[in-house]
Amino acid sequence: MRLDQIFATLFNNQPLTQEQSAEFFRAVVNGEVAPEQLSAALIALKLRGETIDEIAGAVTALLTAAQPFPAPDYPFADIVGTGGDGANTINISTASAIVGASLGLKIAKHGNRSVSSKTGASDLLSCLGVDINMSAENARQALDEIGLAFVFAQKYHTGFKHAVPVRQALKTRTIFNILGPLINPAHAKRQLLGVYSPELLKPYAQTNARLNREHSIIVHGSGLDEVAIHGKTQVAELRDGKIEYYELSPQDFGFDVKPLENLRGGEPRENAEIITALLQGRGTDEQNQAVAMNTALLMKLFGHENIKQNAEQVLAQLASGRAFDTLVKLTAY
C-alpha cells in the first residue's frame, strides 16, 4: 500500500514529494489513517520541519476534498490570520473585511472558531447576527451583492473531523495550524495573511507561489498576526510569481506608533459590542488605526497602491458609519 511507503519515508526523516503529501492528506480526510499513525506522522513532520512541497500537497488535497463553493469570475480576496499570537486583540481582520467590502472590494473571508484567543471570526460574526452556516449559494449571493461572504471552515472541510482527536491530544502546533489560512474553499487567488511568527513569512509566500496564487501579502506585526500599530510590520509580498520582503511602520500609513494594550479584546459578546461601535464610527483612535492599516493593505491587493491614501479613505469610511450598513446587510442572508 502506498501509505506504507509514505510512512517509511517520514519515519526515515526524509521529505515527501508534493504528490505523496497530497495522497497522505487525502487519506487523512477520508478517515483512512489510524489515529496512532496520524499522530506519529504529524510529529515526524513537525520535528523535521514541513517543506513547501509537503504544505502545498496538503493544501491541494484539502481543497479538492472540501465541499464546493461556487467561486466567481471577478477578482476577490481573503483576509485571514493564523491566530496563535497570544495577544487576544479585537477581531481586526474581520472588521477589515467588512470595511473593505463597504468600500467596494469583494471579500470571501475564510474563518473558524477561536483556537487560542477568546473570540474567533465565526464566534464574533455569530454574535453580530450573521448566519455563519449559510449555504454556499447564499454566501456567493452575498459576495455578488454586498461584496462580502463568510466561508466557515468547519462547514466546508468536513474531513477535518478525522484529525480533531489527534490534534487535541497532541496539544502542540502541527502542519494543520499552517494549513488553515491556505485552504479557503472559494479558492481566493488574492490574500492578506497574518502570521504569528516572522519565521512563517517565507514559507507562506513560497507555498502561495507554488500554488500559483496571484497576489498575497503576508504580514507579521511585532508579535501580532496583523499589521502592527505598536511597531514594525514585516512583510512578504508575492505578486506575479515574485516575492519581495520589506518592513512597514505606522508612519508609512500616516500614523504614529500607538500602544497595543488599547486593542485588547474579550469574550465574543464584548468584541461584538466593540466592533459594532467601530463600524458605526464610534471606535477609539487605536481601533480605527488598526483597521485602517490592515484594510489599506487589503486594498493594495486590488490595485490601490498608495497605502497612505488607502488608510485615509478607510478612516473616512469608518467615521461615516457606512461600514455598519454592510454588516447589517450580511445578517439578512
From Swiss-Prot:
It catalyses: N-(5-phospho-beta-D-ribosyl)anthranilate + diphosphate = 5-phospho-alpha-D-ribose 1-diphosphate + anthranilate. Mg(2+) 1 binds at S93, E226. GO terms for cellular component: cytosol. Belongs to the anthranilate phosphoribosyltransferase family. Its EC number is 2.4.2.18. Catalyzes the transfer of the phosphoribosyl group of 5-phosphorylribose-1-pyrophosphate (PRPP) to anthranilate to yield N-(5'-phosphoribosyl)-anthranilate (PRA). Pathway: Amino-acid biosynthesis; L-tryptophan biosynthesis; L-tryptophan from chorismate: step 2/5. It comes from the Bacteria. This is Anthranilate phosphoribosyltransferase. The keyword Metal-binding applies. One of its GO terms (molecular function) is anthranilate phosphoribosyltransferase activity. The keyword Metal-binding applies. Anthranilate 2 binds at R167. Binds 2 magnesium ions per monomer. It comes from Actinobacillus succinogenes (strain ATCC 55618 / DSM 22257 / CCUG 43843 / 130Z). Keywords: Amino-acid biosynthesis, Aromatic amino acid biosynthesis, Glycosyltransferase, Magnesium, Metal-binding, Transferase, Tryptophan biosynthesis. The gene is trpD. SUPFAM superfamilies: Nucleoside phosphorylase/phosphoribosyltransferase catalytic domain, Nucleoside phosphorylase/phosphoribosyltransferase N-terminal domain. InterPro entries: Anthranilate_Pribosyl_Tfrase, Glycosyl_Trfase_fam3, Glycosyl_Trfase_fam3_N_dom, Glycosyl_Trfase_fam3_N_dom_sf, Nuc_phospho_transferase. GO terms for biological process: L-tryptophan biosynthetic process. Anthranilate 1 binds at G81, N112. Homodimer. 5-phospho-alpha-D-ribose 1-diphosphate binds at residues 81, 84-85, 89, 91-94, 109-117, 121. Mg(2+) 2 binds at D225, E226. It is an enzyme of class 2 (transferase).
